[in-house]
């Protein structure tokens, strides 16, 4: 069972050889699904076609690699002028709290400069985003297109 309490943020250690890449190179639906299951992110991992379409339609996909292994993904939609939305941030559990998520967020912020970066968090990730300087807002609504 997943702990739903807010966890205190702890300063991470760091991975020495972390490479950030932009784009879909090295990715496949199976590779993404494996990371998302392990992270865990609730996404359509059992529907490879839909999962791949999500990535192809994204404005920005950043991947983090360590020794040739995929250890993190950030996926963003943006209008390029006002808002960017961080759809996904997934980090391999074995390297969480080692600076991978922070490095991905730093790179997203560089590439989405001049826009407000919005995201949905969970109770577990709230401390991470607060530590990075994100502010919780109450005036947001979520609807689902049917």
Model segments located where?
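Short amphipathic alpha-helix that is part of the acyltransferase structural core
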Residues: 2-48, 140
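Conserved catalytic-core motifs of GNAT/GCN5-like acyltransferases
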Residues: 3-8, 118-120, 130, 135-146
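A conserved beta-strand-loop-helix scaffold within acyl/acetyltransferase catalytic domains
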Residues: 50-89
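Hydrophobic adenine-recognition pocket in adenosine-nucleotide-binding enzymes
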Residues: 89-91, 125
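Conserved acetyl-CoA-binding loop-helix of GNAT-fold acetyltransferases
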Residues: 91, 97-110
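Conserved GNAT acetyl-CoA-binding A-motif
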Residues: 110-123
């Amino acid at each position: 069972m997943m702990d739903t309490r807010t966890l205190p943020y702890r300063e991470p250690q760091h991975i020495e050889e972390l490479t950030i890449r932009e784009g879909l190179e090295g990715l496949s639906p199976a590779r993404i699904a494996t990371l998302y299951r392990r992270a865990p992110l609730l996404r359509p991992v059992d529907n490879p076609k839909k999962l791949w379409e999500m990535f192809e339609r994204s404005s920005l996909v950043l991947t983090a690699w360590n020794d040739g292994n995929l250890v993190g993904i950030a996926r963003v939609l943006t209008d390029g002028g006002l808002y960017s939305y961080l759809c996904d941030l997934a980090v391999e559990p074995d390297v969480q709290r080692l600076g991978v998520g922070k490095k991905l967020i730093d790179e997203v912020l560089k590439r989405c400069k001049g826009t407000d970066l919005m995201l949905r968090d969970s109770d577990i990730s709230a401390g991470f985003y607060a530590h990075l300087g994100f502010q919780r807002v109450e005036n947001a609504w979520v609807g689902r297109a049917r």
